[in-house]
């Protein structure tokens, strides 16, 4: 998981006793965090999640979810919709933690990552504006809405969503 541990703050109090020395809250309590090793970092953890999601979005069409092409399309659309929604959510939390006004009076956000990164990626990029980040989040939400079902339930083979029936699936 990109977050390394479950979200819980109780373990950071004197109410909890942990035996797991690799737990991030134990690392915090024992002073083993550094500026380049912050396990609770929104920057690091959210960008890790976005990297995983971007990689998934790039490779999703190549996965054979089913040998039936129509079923494969249904799976692919739903998974892509979930990925767009998760990327928007992670971008929101990243923007909330690191967006803000700069000395030049501009409201900045964070660098927008639309594609997965590799060793040849230029990592020296400037922050995008807050407005551009919000636009990116809304685009991902719109993509998610287009691809996700209205409700999640157990479906039968005859229970095809109307949008796919209209397409002849």
Residue ranges and their predicted role:
Residues 21-98, 123-132, 142-157:
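Conserved, well-structured interaction surfaces
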Residues 1-13:
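Acidic, glycine-rich segments characteristic of secretory precursors and extracytoplasmic regions
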Residues 82, 89, 162, 167-169:
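Residue register of alpha-helical TPR repeats
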Residues 101-117:
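Short, flexible, mixed-charge acidic loops at enzyme active sites
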